[in-house]
A protein has these predicted regions:
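Alpha-helical, hydrophobic structural elements that either
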Residues: 1-288, 311-349
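Ligand-binding pocket scaffold of soluble enzyme catalytic domains
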Residues: 293, 304-306
């Protein structure tokens, strides 16, 4: 989001142009800029004030800028809680679960899905990008220039924080249509919320937990636990040696769930080792700037529905990867996919 640079440096402000295939940082020289369509719409949604100042009609589609406003005090409260400063603004200082919680609480971050209804036809996004302006940055850090240019162009109040999301919507017809009516629907993308931790030792062990939204009391019962390995050749790398050992837990849920519930490993797993030349031999050395999320962990796919048993659907959760077989019981974390806000529709034209 932010740059650490000489605060006295002031780059020249370029002419404001928006391109369908471009972003805030550049575009193809072959592409023509879109024609601005003033909208000047404001609304409240998901705990934020939103402004849609303009859209841009391009040869390939429609581009819309979404401006989400956040009060300064909300940002300061968030930064104080997580002790965020110039020396601590990196994911390497936080566990995967803490990173998920930070993303959930970040007042300058909201993952949403916009849909347009143009002349009665639905338009979906093909791609997008965003910039963030934070008025509470500590000394030594400044907002990136592109965020400042966007605020200046749209005359947005710099005493607030802003997330400006640019979404591109391809035309649904071969020709650029005349805009007769235009509406927007905002839908929150489900977010992953970490829940209680647990450990299991053997088949037959069980763990009960409540869904944080529905309040349903679920019981997880272990059916199988086994050690497995991934062949090193599956990673397809001659430069890195990857951990290959992991634990698979197969389990059932009662009652059977129609809600999105997953299980992941609380452990980050072992880091890959880079094969570095030492003398005449290749010696693996651990590197801190690489990570593995192929199997388990909060960022990886962790649950697979594997079939039916007499007890109900059978699921499988995979642990993080390690260089040695996992001897201790894995500490698992429940994970819920949740929407906190209902969708809303706004007439733009």
């Amino acid at each position: 989001y932010y740059d650490v640079v000489d605060q006295n440096a002031k780059p020249a402000i370029p002419e404001w142009k928006v391109y369908f295939e471009g972003n805030f940082w550049g575009h193809s020289e072959k592409e023509r800029a879109g024609t601005e369509v003033p909208l000047n719409q404001q609304f409240e949604w998901a705990g934020h004030h939103w402004i849609i100042p303009a859209a841009y009609s391009c040869s390939k589609g429609f581009v819309v800028d979404f401006c989400m406003r956040t009060p300064e005090e909300d940002i300061r409260r968030f930064m104080t809680k997580w002790d965020l400063h110039s020396e601590n603004d990196s994911c390497e200082y936080f566990t995967q679960e803490q990173q998920l919680q930070i993303d959930l609480e970040n007042p300058l971050c909201l993952d949403f899905i916009p849909r347009l209804e143009l002349n009665g036809k639905t338009m979906l996004t093909s791609h997008g990008c965003s910039v963030v302006f934070n008025p509470c940055l500590p000394d030594g850090m400044i907002n990136e220039a592109e965020a400042k240019w966007a605020l200046e162009h749209y005359d947005l109040d710099t005493s607030y924080g802003w997330m400006i999301f640019r979404a591109a919507f391809p035309w649904t017809s071969k020709r650029r249509p005349e805009i007769k009516s235009l509406s927007l629907t905002m839908e929150q993308r489900p977010c992953r919320v970490p829940g209680p931790h647990f450990q299991t030792h053997a088949p037959g062990d069980s763990f009960s937990f409540l869904h944080p939204v529905s309040g349903t009391n679920y019981t997880l019962t272990v059916q199988e636990i086994e050690q497995q390995t991934i062949p090193q050749k599956c990673f397809g790398s001659d430069r890195w040696v990857y951990p290959t050992h992991f634990t698979v837990m197969r389990y059932t849920l009662f009652p059977e769930s129609e809600e999105d519930i997953s299980i992941c490993d609380c452990c980050d797993g072992d880091k890959p080792m880079e094969i570095a030349v030492e003398g005449d031999s290749f010696t693996p050395e651990t590197q801190n700037n690489a990570c593995v999320g192929i199997i388990g962990g909060a960022d990886g796919p962790t649950v697979i529905m594997t079939g039916e048993k007499s007890q109900g659907r059978l699921y499988a959760a995979c642990s993080a990867l390690h260089f040695e077989p996992v001897r201790d019981d894995v500490e698992w974390c429940t994970m819920f996919s949740i929407k906190n806000f209902d969708e809303t529709t706004i007439n733009l034209i």
